[in-house]
């Protein structure tokens, strides 16, 4: 039993610092643009898209790595970056809106 408690404590010590180091980044959707248009984050970080326009938008990766579906006006959507790579994304409703999420 004592060994099991020690194992649980060691595992908790290994897991907790990773979560504590994760950062949150914000992409603002406004005036038919994603701001910033290019964002680089680390694996495990969270990205929040906030729609400040008066109509819905999406944040949809070209390779379907993520898809917010409709983000209503004054609403938000978040995504945890789990896989490294370069993710070009756009708004399905307004195809001229493009941006890039880099995950290191």
Where are these regions (language model features)?
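Extracytoplasmic copper-binding redox domains, predominantly the cupredoxin/blue-copper superfamily
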Residues: 2, 10-11, 17-104
């Amino acid at each position: 039993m004592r060994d099991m408690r020690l194992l649980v404590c060691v595992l908790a010590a290994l897991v907790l610092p990773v979560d504590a180091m994760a950062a949150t980044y914000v992409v603002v959707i406004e005036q038919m643009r994603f701001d910033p248009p290019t964002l680089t984050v680390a694996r495990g970080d969270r990205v929040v898209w906030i729609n400040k326009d008066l109509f819905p938008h999406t944040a949809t990766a070209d390779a379907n790595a993520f898809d917010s579906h409709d983000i209503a006006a004054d609403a938000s959507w978040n995504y945890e970056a789990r896989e490294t790579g370069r993710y070009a994304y756009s708004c399905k409703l307004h195809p001229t809106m493009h941006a890039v999420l880099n995950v290191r």
